[in-house]
Amino acid sequence: MMLIKNIVTLDQLESSDYLYKLISSVLPSLCLDYKIDPKLANGYVHALDTIYSPELISILTDGERSQQLDTLGINYILSRKNDLGIYFPINIRENGEIVSTWNKNTGGYTNPIPCTISFNDLPPFTKILIQIRTMGCEAHARYFGGYVEHPSSPNILSPKINPNISFANSYIHSLTYPYIEGRADYSTYRPLLINGIMEKKDLANLLNVRALLEPMSRAIFDAIFKIQFHCNANNIVLVQNPNIDTDLITMQTLKYLVMYFQHFSGFTLRDIYLGGVRIRVDNSMLASYVVSIYFSKEIKYIEDNKLFSLDYIDQFVFRPDNSNLNITVTAQQLGIRILNMTSNRPYIINLLNIVSKSLVRHRNVPKEISLFWDGMSYDEYKNMKFIDMMFLGTTCYLFALYNKNGITYCSMLNDVLRAEETPIRICVFPRILKGKTIPTLIREILENINNISVRDFPKYDTHDVKHIGLSDAGFMLFFQFLRLMENKEPHIAVKEILMAYTGIKIDDKGSPYYITPESYRTFIFMLFKAMGFNVRVNRTTISSHSYTSYYVSPRVSKRYLTNMLQKASCSQSEAEKLLSSAHDLVSFMLSVNNSSNRDSYRRINRSFFGGFKESASEEDATLVQFISPVNILDRINVKGILSANALNEIMDTDVFLPENANFKENLKQLLKEDTIDGKSIAHIIPLNTIDRLIVSAGGVSVGELLENLDERVPDENATNEVIELITNALKDRNMKDSNFIATNILNSITQISEKQMDGIKKITCHGTMMFKELAMHIYFTERYFKAKISDDVKISILEKYRDFIELSKSLYKDLIGIDQIKSVLSIVHRTGRNIDDNPITQEDIQKAYNIARPKILKLTNYYTEMTKSYFENIKRIMNPEDANAVVFDNE
């Protein structure tokens, strides 16, 4: 069994630092087809956070959120008593605002294993909950977190803080709803307003309580709650002086008297009778009688089950009107327990209401055990695969429940293990980022990398306009005219350029000159600048590509050009004729943002990739983007590598520091703009990380990091070829000229071989997608339509795919063989040597070729392993009966 104490976690990192480390270090260790546990798609947040941050709602399942809110409402009401207040450090204000009163008070139960993590990446109430959980006892955290017990949940050892009551209710909704009628200094009742009109249920309650009040209090009551207005709005006739029975023995229900003592005791009751006799009694004694009679069953249930500790009195005392003698009725005579309502009347009534509803409503039961609260057994955790254990440790906070001195506590798993305590349960808390759990984000990233994007396989738009209708000579003449244009008013510049173009076009002959990608950028900049457009340039690096963005404003449109011509004294008809005469040029101008060639120019709508955030005025601009791969020397940390003199120094060097630094900044930008999702992150991941992920996914060994050192260090980074080249150069700083040339030849050949391999991989993946689609059609035909396709068809397809791969490999070897000859002459020319003066011997050429051969062989071996995995995947999809009829050739 592995050493559990060595499990990898990223607990101390947060925000972009955490995300960067996760993607750059952990993601490459996962296979592309790594299956993430569906249970991790949802996580945990305190339900109060979802009230103010709706994007967090998706973290919880619908049932889990509603049940948690139900329990939180109950626990909040029960905690308004002093001895429970410290266990629910939240206060809901009159306007529905929820504020924290957390002051690190754990009620005397201090966790013996302290936690050093700040949890600043968590929403506010979730952060408080985690602090309570890691600083106090588990029961405290469950009370504040709205824990709902599952029938199979393991028991915990801790002081009993609450009776674990949970049923469907709207307490939190009512307490936090901001649109209410009334004033808190007169009543705690919160009648809800919908579109400014009081709900009928609340209005009915108010009218029944109003009938119990004496006239002067009734008038104040009407003014505070706007009774007349809401009665009219609800089509209810208001009785100004209601006549009701207020005899405690004969009145229809005590409900509204109970409600009076719960919310409206600041108003004055009308005369109260008992057996036809008007009585004089103070409010606390009357409340004791009314509440005890109304909740007699609930009081007995509380006593029988020892749910709460209530205070009682032995008798009910009142005085008949016009009498000096008190009459006493004992609890024994009434056959009930009489509550002492001298203090805390609203709280006691709320408590009894909760117990009453719990007896008649269905108890909340979660569908499954909670990973956050109940977790998994320690043995189950220890028996997990290492990759699953590492994934949990880096994408989730891992807590451990443990018992100490008869109390159950919860601390970080690593802290518990270091303290040499034995965990009883491992609780999993998926980390959250911008409304998603990190496991969900990783799944999206893997899916987007699996789904081949335009970045990996360029799609050329056949509708792009790459010419302006002029021949080579005509284009150069027009280009020179643009260079000579001085700064002029936009309307004048537009007219002069269109007229000049039309004049050149009349005498121009020959086929159109197609603008090369190298000239395109310069031409559109000069064209729009000369026409008076404002061209703003932004440059940034995304993934391993350089993005140059041109914002041309105002937006290029035919309407704008027409307006400029009319402003330059052209009539509507003249403007249309001039635009028609310059049709090819105008079409080119209108199509500049339609290109989609990855290595040339294309339009991306996301403002992030322009290097800045668009303002409202820039929405009316035309965006053109030029995208090109970053040179390999600009991607690597040349200074760091060259300054390393030992193996350990090279291993500690961040080889791809420049593009990793750009990646980290791009992550910060995504977080700042709230555009975090799998697609956006997959787009900005640098190629050195993508290379490692793809290689790992195929299970391929990519050779050694340092080929010519005695200690051979394996690495999974295909892009790390460049490290080997630079390290070889470091071995001997006084190389002979011939060795220097040979090393440079190797550099050139390796880069060329990688470039050619990229082209072959793209061709292969395009072909593989067609074969895979064909295999999927066969799969669905057999699976869903129950039609049997013979093995001959399946084997024929596999043989064709194998032949396709062999043809691609043969083409690659031919390309490298020819490029090798070119590279030799190119390197000699760049070093300033003359072949006649410094002849290169056959021995030098042979040495360069021998060094290059294993590099090329390594790439072909990697390609073979990759295509073999594709071949096996297609075979598995089609599932021929004779699986050995055709096999993949590893040679």
UniProtKB/Swiss-Prot annotation:
The keyword Lipid biosynthesis does not apply. It comes from the Viruses. InterPro entries: Poxvirus_P4A. It is found in: Virion. Keywords: Virion. GO terms for molecular function: structural molecule activity. One of its GO terms (cellular component) is virion component. Belongs to the poxviridae protein P4a family. Core protein 4a is the most abundant virion protein. Major component of the virion core that undergoes proteolytic processing during the immature virion (IV) to mature virion (MV) transition. Interacts with P39/A4. This is Major core protein 4a precursor. The lineage of its organism: Viruses, Varidnaviria, Bamfordvirae, Nucleocytoviricota, Pokkesviricetes.
